[in-house]
Amino acid sequence: MSELSEELSLKKENSFLSRLSNFARREKIEKIRGVYIWGGVGRGKSMLMDLFFANVNIHNKKRTHFHNFMAETHDLIHDIRKNDKIKNVPDHAAKLISQKAKLLCFDEMELRDIADAMVLNRLFKGLWKRGVTIVATSNRPPEKLYEKGLHRERVLPFIDDLNKNCEV
């Protein structure tokens, strides 16, 4: 995969944008496959992600609201399931998504139901396996996603993967 971004000209070496830019360097792609930006409402999370998205030096990228991405993903999975020969539907969805975008930026990531959580775990594994970088904003830290949801224990592997693969 070609280098994801050019070095942003920043005065402070340790600033957030500097770290965001540095994660995209080729030598770090193997280790960090994304960034998860969380904080309170109106703190500038979306603005930081938009700055990164605007300055990243790749063409096959997508920025969307997380809710819209999940709606598109459920539609895609529904279409894939029509083909009985495909066994691992979320992985196949990840393959199709990765053919269109090597960088996915999600605004306002949240988990509202167990169906989304179960799909995301397998989908994100497939995306990361194919070299897709994920940048997401959220009002909650990963550990608080789907905090009081039904069968939350099934979401914990996804949260662990999110923490392992993303700079939080």
List each model region and its residues.
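Phosphate-binding P-loop
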Residues: 7-17, 23-32
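Hydrophobic anchor at the beta1->P-loop junction of P-loop NTPases
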Residues: 37
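Walker A (P-loop) phosphate-binding loop of P-loop NTPases
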Residues: 42
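Conserved lysine of the Walker
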Residues: 45
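AAA+/P-loop NTPase substrate/partner-engagement loops
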Residues: 54-84, 92
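Structural recognition of the conserved hydrophobic beta-strand(s) that form the central parallel beta-sheet
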Residues: 64, 104-106, 133-138
